[in-house]
Each structure stands twice: as C-alpha cells, then as structure tokens.
Amino acid sequence: MILATAVASEQPKEGIDFFPLTVEYQEKFAAAGRIPGSFHRREGRASDYEVLICRLVDRAIRPMFADNFVNDTQVLIYLISADENVEPDSLVGLAASAALSISSIPFEGPISEVRVAKIEGQFIVNPTPKEAENATLNIILAGTVENILMVEGESKEASEADLIEAIKTGHEVIIKQCHAQTELQQKCGKPKMAVAVPVEDAELEQKVKDFCVSKIEQVALAALGKHERKTLLKQIKQDFIANYPEEDLEIFNKELFSKYYNKIEKNTIRRVVLNNKIRLDGRKTDEIRPLYMEVDALPSPHGSALFTRGETQSLTTVTLGSKTDEQMIDKAEKLSFNKFMLHYNFPPFSTGE
C-alpha cells in the first residue's frame, strides 16, 4: 500500500520563472516489518533508489501543471505496507497522480506509470521482482490517455519493434488507470483553485521580436563555439535595453522582457536548425562532436580515463576492492549487497557557475 499526499500554498511565489515542485518518496521499514539498520535505528535520508523514484515521478507530473502556476507544491509519497511480489516503483506515479487529481491543485492530468518487461517472449506489465530477473527488456513508462510522457529502462540489445510493442502494451494499461482516476475525481475531487493570470505586454513582445529575431538568426548561422555564441546572444539582450526609449525605462518590465526574449531565442534557434539542417556549431544534424579519449590519465588510482566530446569532458576513476567493500543496500523489503557502484558528481564549475 502506498500513501500519496499533495499540498500547495495558497499564494503564488513571486519573482520566479519556474515551478517550485518538490517530490519525495520514502519506503518505511515498518512497511515490511523491519527495523532500520542505521546506528540510531531510525528512518534516515532518502536512499539512491528512493531519489531515482522521486525523479521518475517528477519528470512525469511536472509538465502537467499550467505554465503560470508557481505556487509551492509538495508531493510526498510513502510505502506503508510492502509486498515482496510487487515493485512499488511502478505504482508511485499512479499514487501521486491520483492524489493530485482529487486535490484542489490545478493538475492537468491524470497520468500513470507502469513497468513493462519482455520475459520469455511475452510482454508483462508490472512483473514481480523474481519475474523481472529474466527480462530481456525492462522499462518504466509514464503517460496520459493521449500521450507518452517518459520512458526509462534497460535491455539486452532489444529491437526497435520490441520497444514500440512494450510501449503500446504499457500505454493500454496507463489509459485504464487514467480513466479510473477520472472516475475517482468525479466522485470525491475538490474544486480546482484559480490560477493567477500572468501579466502580459503584447507591445513589448513585438518590440523584442522586431529587434532580436534577425540578430539571433545571424548568431545561429555563424557556426560559433559555445562561449562565443553565449557572449553574442547576451549582447543582443543588452543592446535591446540600451536602445529602449529612455522615457519608457521607468516602466520597463525586465522580468517580462527576459521571458519574451528567452522564448523568442529558443523558437528562432530551433527554426534555424530545422530549416537548415545545421547545428549551431556548424555540424550537420547527424554529425557528432569530435571525440578524444585518454586512459591512465592519473598516476595513483587503480584506473582512470579522460573522455572529451567537443567542449564536454569527463574525468573518471575506477577502484577495485574485495568482497568486504560491497555496498549494503538496506531497503524496506530486503537487505542486499551491491558489488558495482557508480558515483556521479556534477559540481557547479562544470557549467561555469
């Protein structure tokens, strides 16, 4: 059994251009009749497994809110009664969507998530953990009645036809689960709260288009490097403000300007790339960036490598250990050990911040 709750603040958060959504998932050890293995024997911070499930839910529900809805919103989900034959990760999205659907939050769902595995030639929806061990294809997909929102998983060299069939099989179940949520909403759903109408300025938007579009096109077609391109695009924004009538600067809305400019820049660059079949750095759409690889880049670690693709670099190390170095995975359903650990770090300087 899964408990899902959804709460949103009554007032929108001012001065932001993103949706402040928080999704948390936790598997209570009591759900499986277990005591946590930590020193204090209390529930601790979210495990990597729980964080990954949070991301699955977040990616599925985040697009389903109005663009101008910026109220703080929390979706908290707990496993409160476990079943060793059921993987909860494929049900968490359904629970979150159901909670949002019957709440007063302006959620434009419902959505649902299911796991689909190909086992001995058959496509099975939400297989048991034991069944999934023999899967040659194993995916989680999220969707609405009309569309697929997200697909994530793994396979052993699955064909494109198998992947499409798995998605079709899962979507049939998603449609049924969405219809069930709609019925639930009609029976006990709360009236949806009103969403604040965003302030718009059609005259300012047109001025931004007239001044910026041609300049953005020139930058997009110049086959420049990332840093030079970023500098020139930033200069376009500065030039617009510098050329804005001085008598109107007192009422100039910088937030609206940034909103309009970002939308226009995105749409203009997308149109240029699609029409010309050339990427921003001059590559064709089917041409990859230059690759460079170097092994043993560091003298002391057991192994290391430097991988470079264009302006993107990854420095990796590998450490070998004995069985005593295995990672203990203390989940609600069972205690297990992991002999391969992949740790990923993305510090702020990676993007120049």
List the model feature ranges, each with a label:
Residues 1-9, 13, 196-336:
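Extended amphipathic alpha-helical scaffolds
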Residues 18, 109-111, 134-136, 286, ...:
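Short beta-strand-initiation
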Residues 10-12, 61-66, 101-104, 113, ...:
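A generic local secondary-structure boundary/capping motif
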Residues 1-86, 145, 152, 302-353:
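Glycine-rich, flexible beta-strand/loop modules in the N-terminal catalytic cores of phosphate-handling
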Residues 104-224:
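Mobile "lid/hinge" segments at catalytic clefts and subdomain interfaces of large enzymes
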Residues 18, 23, 44-66, 70-76, ...:
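Alpha/propeptide regions of enzymes that mature by internal proteolysis
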Residues 79, 83-88, 97, 110-117, ...:
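Conserved mixed alpha/beta core segments that line enzyme active sites in large multi-domain catalysts
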